[in-house]
């Protein structure tokens, strides 16, 4: 699973989901992308499941870029534990995805293959997404 090698703070405050994505809203690497329509925390397991779904569908052709990384730990206290005695231990890692963020990019495959691969990946994620592709001038647009 994806997680940082080391972090400055082991148990930070929970990440915010307010607002739209500041960066990463345009295609940078690939020809096709999967863009978030709504915000959510995406866990490292969900990112990995989406990556596997894309990889299996496109087989050996094409290249995949993952533009999100789970760098926020989410803590949990054990079940039936009394209140107090500090903050819980880190349980899993999440990436904060805000509306407009391009999460996955693909290149080297046809549009039909990319559309289906990203559709399969979107079923592994807990948010609404849309397929975007690079225009002739270089800008991305939705379809």
From Swiss-Prot:
Question: Could you tell me the keywords of this UniProt record?
Answer: Ribonucleoprotein, Ribosomal protein, RNA-binding, rRNA-binding, tRNA-binding
The UniProt annotation puts the region (Disordered) at 1-22
- PROSITE patterns linked to this entry: RIBOSOMAL_L16_1, RIBOSOMAL_L16_2
Going by the entry's taxonomy, the superkingdom of the source organism is recorded as: Bacteria
Does this UniProt record's set of keywords contain Ribonucleoprotein? yes
Could you tell me where the Basic residues compositional bias lies?
1-21
Q: PANTHER family in the record, alphabetically? A: 50S/60S RIBOSOMAL PROTEIN L16, LARGE RIBOSOMAL SUBUNIT PROTEIN UL16M
Q: Which NCBIfam families match?
A: rplP_bact
What protein name is recorded for this chain? Large ribosomal subunit protein uL16
